Every structure is written in structure tokens, then in C-alpha cells.
């Protein structure tokens, strides 16, 4: 197993948010554009930990967080005397969703919508999977945005959508299954508007990425741009340029010239209208 995968695995399975700096971790951070150096340590946000997981899966075909005991305490109780041996959190297996516009969920045979400011947490086996595929689906990377889903300025084609948090622990499995069955024309991803975020969007290989509709107007002068974050993503920028084409390649080149890195939170807080770019 490559040293990078082993290092990411130890971080994720150990539930850690920081590591000591070293050659391996410096390489990982240069490649992915995540992590904040604090003295002799590198600190990661929950979203960055999820990016590390996706990086490992995309680059090496391995899930560094896989654990055969996954499934929660109820599942563990069926074959072990101590249900507390499960590494899962109490609510970690629940999917976190919201419904925008006229979209709705079918949960345990009932139609469900979410009022503004609220979200729904549900077991994946309670969802009507066939109905789910008929709805538009927007995957949000930053879970902190979920209570503010109504403020996301979705493009017209995704105005009526189920909004689903991408997850960061056990619920990632349920999200992955839903995404695998979702029609590409009914799927969109909302990541940071920076090299790392859009490279991660390309890794998905399906659906569309949501970007600012007027991205050409964003630049070094933009007050909520984070050029320092952009400069830490040189390897991710190269990966994006090497793989992107069309509008996404033009975006990558614009990011490079303007040192652009705009977080999802700022796009939502400032009511920036989004546009959908197909990934394939």
C-alpha cells in the first residue's frame, strides 16, 4: 500500500484533524491543496478530510476509511455482544437532505419536503430509491451550508432539486450508492470554486459542476477571494488544466491568472448565481 494511502488511512480512521509534518504529508498536501500548516503540524477541516478520502479513491482506487465493522451500533449488535465496538457515530449513518422548489422525497411511503431552514436526516433504506432517481440531485460538499440550502442560487435547470450533504463518515456509503444510480443529467456537484474543488468535481466523472455564472467577473480584486489558498493548490491546478476542456479549462486558466479561490460559503452568503457545467 502506498505511503500516501497509509497516511490518509491513519488520519481518517483515527478521527484526527491534524498530523505532524513530514515528507509524505507535504507531498499529499501539495497534490491536493488541502491542509493548514501550524508550526510542525498540518491541520485539516472536516471538508478537507473528505477531500483526502476522495483523492485516495480517485488516484488509487482504494477507500482509506473502509472498515468491515461499519454499519452502526444496530448492525454491530446483530453479530457481536458489544454494539459499542462499532466505530460509527450515533447519527453518522443518516443521510442529510433538503428539498428545493417543487422537489420532494418519498420516505417510508410518505411524500416529504423540508421548510426553509430545516433539513431531514434519514436512513438510506427508508428512501424510495426509484422515486429518488426522478428528481434532480445537488450534492453539497460543505455540511455547514445545509441549514442555508434555500440561499443557494441554483441555476434554472436545478431550481427544483433534492439537496444532499456529501457526508464525511458512515453516511458517505449511502450517498455513493444514490449517486451511482442517479441519471447524469439530474446530478450536480457544488464544490469550492478553486483548483482543488473543481479538480475534485472532475474526479466524480458524472453530472455537472456548479460554478458562478459570471465567473469571468471574479478576480484578484474580489474581496472574498482567497489568493493564499489558491497558491497552495499549484499541483491541483496542474491536474485540473491537464484534464479539463471547454469552459472548465477556460475557468482553470482564469483561476491561474487571477489566483482565484472562492469558498462555497462566500458564494452562498453573497447570493452568487450558479451555472451548471457538464463534467462529461
Where are these regions (language model features)?
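Nucleic-acid enzyme cleavage-core boundary/entry regions
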Residues: 1-184, 196, 202-280
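Terminal interaction module
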Residues: 187-192
